[in-house]
Amino acid sequence: MKRLPSLLTICLLLTALAATRSLSQTPEKRVLSLDDLAAIRHVSDPQVSPEGNWVAYTVRTLDMKEDKRNSHIWMTSWDGSRSVQLTSSKDSETTPRWSPDGQYLAFLSGRGDEGEIDQLWLMNRAGGEAQRITELKGGVNDFVWSPDSKRLALVVKDPDPDAPDPKDKDKEKKTAKPIVIDRFQFKQDEIGYLDNRRQHLYLLDLATRKAEALTPGNYDELQPSWSPDGSTIAFVSKRGPDPDRSDNYDIYLIETKVSAAARQLTTFKGADSDPDWESSLAWSPDGKSIAYIQGGASELIYYAVHQLAVIPAAGGQTRLLASSLDRNMTRPSWSADGASLYFVLEDNRSEHLARVPASGGSIERVVGGQRVVGAFDVNPTGKLAFLSSTPNEPAEVFALDAREPRRLTRQNDELVAKLKLSAIEEISFKSKDGTAINGFVVKPPDYQSGKRYPTILRIHGGPVSQFDNSFFFEWQMLAARGYVVVAANPRGSSGRGQAFSKAIWADWGNKDAQDVLAAVDYAVAQGIADPSRLGVGGWSYGGMLTNYTIAQDTRFKAACSGASISNILAGYGTDQYIREYEAELGTPWSNPAAWMKVSFPFLHADRIVTPTLFLCGDKDFNVPLLNSEQMYQALRSLGRDTQLVIYPGQFHEITKPTYQRDRLARYLGWYDKYLMPRPDGESGSPARNSR
């Protein structure tokens, strides 16, 4: 008689069989392709519910079929076990905000609006469809709940009295009125020509759905923040005889009733809570203090370090809580007990979640390491959720438990699990004058030690920004193609203090160019880069520094210069940087030598021999198209290999998905043509190089 196997034996056999089958069915990892651009899910804006059981957040994706970006609101349970998509309309939804009583989740959307203007919507947690709450002609740009959940403060732009009715079928046939300009700064990217319409605060009564203007006048009012007792709103405004001529933002207070007069709280001659600096106003839980981010003196423009500050709400002296640390700080938020302040601390190649006692003292890096912490939220019970990205993981939402990060969302896990991503290595080296410079090197996934690879130097924009330990699709794409990517943070970058950033003051294309060239020298010396197959490229200031670099070094066989300028004289009055130009360079007629000095890539275009691809959006008011046109024309006149690609309807940021893909494909096509030519002599078009 045969002996039957035991239940344990059967279970073990079945487990082994399942494991074998699982292993045999596990797909082999592949390198990243251009098609994966549309698969990345961009997670942002975590918001913890008042009771702490849920975290709302947004997910942005690219819809290649409809050729648009979509943003929808999701929610994850605090333990991370459940993830729910809350909105799924054909239009986007952003800015989820819980009402303090937990009954509603408000958000912004242009749903059903012919002009695609954002309005305020409410979703009742008890169930039912979201409802549109406002129908304001100027739309809603921002909002914040009152502590009692009965009102909301809105940021609303004055409507354009000359704007055509979106429902008018003949609006395209009507002649537009002339544009009349009388402002000092009269252009801004994504907005266009600036008129005298402003953004104002409105009070919305939730019961009556009536919105009334709280701050009429000739100034913009931004970043509203309610006092804990609901009696006062703090906001930021730039006032004075001609606000366009400085970045001197100040904090004001106003009672929450129509016709109340605003009272100025800060008087620092620089930016208090600059709206362009990921800042906001944060009342202490007891209502006695307001935390914010203070910039440097106005004359330092964007080179100044931004510091965490606290001021008494009743008025008084501002205190800088971490002035001993020469680093940028953003996103101030009080702890639930008011004893300390959380903020994001930018450091060398990373951004960390930090905390400092409200009375001042030592800074604690609550979440550190080789990562980039982004937006975060602390709810009234002290629960904290934050965004975190690493070089091999796009941003996801994490919870902070006992000072340890715990992951809540896994929006990109399925994609990342399929990919053979390149490791990102931190590097440090010396520039020509001995200055220590930091950066990254990215090697192909199947990199072989001892073999030299075609190498591309990528340069970041800014200039006061940095390459950091976050996920860069572009780096992974180039590495997957077989390139080594070298990315440096030259002088002018952020992350290493004000003096390091200001080292290029009125001296663009000199020290910073030497620093990025030293990165290439490092890669060659390490036996990684093939010195005969070098490429370079960047966008915005990265494109500018590309032009500076190829105008003084002929080693590069291919360059991609995006949204760049070389003839700085051409920027005066044609882009949005008039205030910064005059602060740093003076005026062209009072200091022509300074302007000529930084315009040398155009004035000495004959020194450029590198085949160069120029790219730009035709509606870019940040670094307008005319600058790319000039450089293209100069190189074309000299008989150099060059090409100009113009993206219709695009601003400084290329947002249309098919254009995003096209740009990356053209990078690959251009670099391949000169750095990895095929045996048949064909260069490869974007279509042929799309994977």
Which residues fall in each region the model found?
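Short, solvent-exposed loop/turn segments at conserved positions within beta-propeller repeat blades
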Residues: 65-70, 112-118, 192-198, 243-249, ...
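Predominantly five- to eight-bladed beta-propeller fold
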Residues: 69-71, 157-204, 248-250, 305-308, ...
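Conserved beta-propeller blade repeats
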Residues: 41-56, 90-108, 129-130, 135-152, ...
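Bacterial N-terminal signal peptides
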Residues: 9-18
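Cap/lid segment of the alpha/beta-hydrolase catalytic domain
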Residues: 165, 241, 298, 403, ...
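Mature N-terminal segment immediately following signal peptide/propeptide cleavage
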Residues: 26-67, 71, 201
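Short loop/turn segments that connect beta-strands within beta-propeller blades
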Residues: 77-81, 124-128, 205-209, 255-259, ...
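Active-site-proximal cap/loop segments of hydrolase catalytic domains
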Residues: 472, 487-691
